[in-house]
Amino acid sequence: MAECKRITVEPLTREAFAPFGQLIAFSEHPEDERFEVLIREEVHPWRIAMFRVRIRQAQRLECHPESMESFEPVRGMGVLLCAAPDCPEEIHAFPLDTPVCLNKGVWHEVIALSGEALYKITENCEVSSEFYPFSQPVGVEICISGKEEKA
């Protein structure tokens, strides 16, 4: 197996993820405990898709300059790699066990920790994509109780 760049997975919190998007979860004090609009964009029609992930290392990042994109876990476990629009080399990694919505233009890729991970995606009907290839593959390191596990 070729050597790859290792990224440490960070806890997925509102604050840590804020530069890239937002968690799809109730706010701390919603006005209505049953229903809360979290993300709204009235400009473009949207679509729902299923996304199957089997890769264990990322070869590239992609971004969608004109579309936000949600990732909602259905089955399996994966890690979301993210980078700000102007810094694709400064990669952050988050466990993708909570629904999230990426801001427009955020560089991203999902890698699987389980054999396969399945996600529901919501995005604009028409999505333009840009790609940023890595010079070497990118994987993740997970620290559990002070012990490193490589994926």
Task: Label every model-predicted segment.
Residues 1-95, 110-151:
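Active-site region of the double-stranded beta-helix
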Residues 97-105, 117:
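Extracellular beta-helix/beta-solenoid repeat scaffolds
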